[in-house]
Amino acid sequence: MEITTTQVLGILLIALIPGILAYRLANELAK
């Protein structure tokens, strides 16, 4: 099974989006 650049980017996005949301939420709560 080959992994294409598109699949890698998709996996990165799926991994990053919850992290970014949690980071922004933490910043909001820290104010």
UniProtKB/Swiss-Prot annotation:
Superkingdom per UniProt: Eukaryota
Membrane topology, record value: Single-pass membrane protein
One Pfam family this sequence matches: PsaM
Example GO biological process: photosynthesis
GO cellular component: chloroplast thylakoid membrane; photosystem I
Cellular compartments annotated: Plastid, Chloroplast thylakoid membrane
Entries under InterPro entries matching the protein: PSI_PsaM, PSI_PsaM_sf
Transmembrane domains' residue ranges: 7-26
Family, as annotated: Belongs to the PsaM family.
Name used for this protein in its record: Photosystem I reaction center subunit XII
Organism in which the protein naturally occurs: Lepocinclis buetschlii
